[in-house]
């Protein structure tokens, strides 16, 4: 494969990886959103402390809007993230209209509450039970949380990327473009050199005299010398 074509493929691959829909490899894409599980235990005073773990990354606590999304989160939680049995959902109980709402302000169009859940209170939070996929109600007053599931819509807001990330991405792209151009130049010089080589090594022109004629001329010269 020509150097230029190979370099172009490398450039395309790197550009795709850098500018993928999700911020980085720790995020997982599903439908129109990206998800990441922050595997750290933090001490908290209220749910806002947990939520800050996500908002610091330009995201929010997870919201779930259909059965497919719930199943995806459950499957990824079990197989990839290895999260806790009870995962805090990004919802709160609004006493003004006596209903649960999502922190990310999306509509509450789906729920999966377990049948035995009881009365809703002002300090009631929602949890995803990882063994069954059902939602449970629990007290928002907690001292610590093991793992936080964050969600953000695509496209990810680039302002939350660090300066180092942007710098590295720029350097990678610039280096790849340079390699692509260099590869194209090398390939061009190689092709030109190959064409010149065919001309340089073309067969030498034949003498107008055959070997026999040359031998006769040589013998005549020798005979003349002997007469002298």
Curated annotation (Swiss-Prot):
One GO MF term: carbohydrate binding
S-S pairs: 125-140
Gene3D superfamilies the UniProt entry points to: Mannose-Binding Protein A, subunit A (3.10.100.10)
PROSITE patterns with a match to the protein in the record: C_TYPE_LECTIN_2
Signal peptide interval: 1-20
Domain annotation C-type lectin: ranges: 30-149
Database matches in SMART domains: CLECT (SM00034)
Positions on the Cytoplasmic side per record topology: 187-228
Protein name: CD302 antigen
Species per Swiss-Prot/TrEMBL record: Rattus norvegicus
Taxonomy of the source species: Eukaryota, Metazoa, Chordata, Craniata, Vertebrata
Gene: Cd302
């Amino acid at each position: 494969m020509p150097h230029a074509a190979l370099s172009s493929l490398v450039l395309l691959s790197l550009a795709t990886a850098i500018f993928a829909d999700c911020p980085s490899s720790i995020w997982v894409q599903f439908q129109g959103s990206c998800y990441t599980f922050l595997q750290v235990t933090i001490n908290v005073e209220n749910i806002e402390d947990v939520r800050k773990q996500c908002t610091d990354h330009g995201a929010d606590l997870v919201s779930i809007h259909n059965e497919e999304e719930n199943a995806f989160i459950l499957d990824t939680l079990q197989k990839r993230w290895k999260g806790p049995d009870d995962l805090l959902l990004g919802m709160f109980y609004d006493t003004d209209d006596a209903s649960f709402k999502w922190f990310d302000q999306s509509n509450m169009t789906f729920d999966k509450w377990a049948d035995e859940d009881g009365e809703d209170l002002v300090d009631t939070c929602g949890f995803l039970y990882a063994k069954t996929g059902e939602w449970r109600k629990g007290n928002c007053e907690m001292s610590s949380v093991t793992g936080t599931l964050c969600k953000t819509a695509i496209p990810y807001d680039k302002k939350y990327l660090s300066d180092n990330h942007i710098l590295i991405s720029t350097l990678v792209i610039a280096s790849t473009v340079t390699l692509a151009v260099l590869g194209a130049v090398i390939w061009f010089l190689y092709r030109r050199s190959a064409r010149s080589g065919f001309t340089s090594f073309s067969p030498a022109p034949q003498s107008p005299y055959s070997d026999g004629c040359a031998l006769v001329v040589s013998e005549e010269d020798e005979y003349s010398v002997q007469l002298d």
